[in-house]
């Protein structure tokens, strides 16, 4: 089962995260794990590590062929009494890269 999530990095850029597993978290917390994105020296490639509990996964950062827009739907007030309520879509961000974790989790060192 493949699970896809959106995360916000330190530089406020959104990434699409693709994991070939199910991630669990405590019911009272939104925190799942720690994600680190590392740019390789002498290269434009980026790698990522995700630590969840006592396991970690290694992944790669890839550019998306087509960027994705993150939209927020809001209810707009009707213009007059006779018009029906309408909805507005606001573009919050553009996702240009994804982080793909395709291997099984490994125990932390």
Swiss-Prot record:
One of its GO terms (molecular function) is ATP hydrolysis activity. GO terms for cellular component: chromatin; Ctf18 RFC-like complex. The keyword DNA-binding applies. It comes from the Eukaryota. Component of the ctf18-RFC complex which consists of ctf18, ctf8, dcc1, rfc2, rfc3, rfc4 and rfc5. InterPro entries: Ctf8 (IPR018607). Essential for the fidelity of chromosome transmission. Required for the DNA replication block checkpoint. Replication factor C (RFC) complex has an essential but redundant activity in sister chromatid cohesion establishment. An RFC-like complex (ctf18-RFC) is formed where ctf18 replaces rfc1 in the RFC complex along with the association of dcc1 and ctf8. This complex is required for efficient establishment of chromosome cohesion during S-phase. Acts as a PCNA loader, loading PCNA onto primed templates. The keyword DNA-binding applies. Disulfide bonds: none annotated. This is Chromosome transmission fidelity protein 8. GO terms for biological process: DNA replication; mitotic sister chromatid cohesion. Belongs to the CTF8 family. Keywords: Cell cycle, DNA replication, DNA-binding, Nucleus. Its main location: nucleus. The gene is ctf8.
């Amino acid at each position: 089962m493949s699970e896809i999530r959106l995360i916000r990095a330190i530089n406020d850029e959104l990434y699409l995260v693709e994991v070939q597993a199910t991630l669990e978290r405590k019911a009272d917390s939104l925190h799942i794990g720690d994600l680190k994105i590392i740019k390789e020296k002498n290269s434009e490639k980026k790698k990522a590590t995700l630590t969840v509990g006592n396991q970690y996964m290694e992944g790669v950062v890839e550019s998306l062929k087509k960027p994705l827009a993150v939209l927020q739907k809001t209810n707009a007030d009707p213009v007059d009494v006779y018009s029906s309520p309408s909805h507005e879509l606001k573009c919050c961000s553009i996702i240009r890269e994804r982080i793909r974790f395709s291997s099984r989790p490994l125990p932390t060192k």
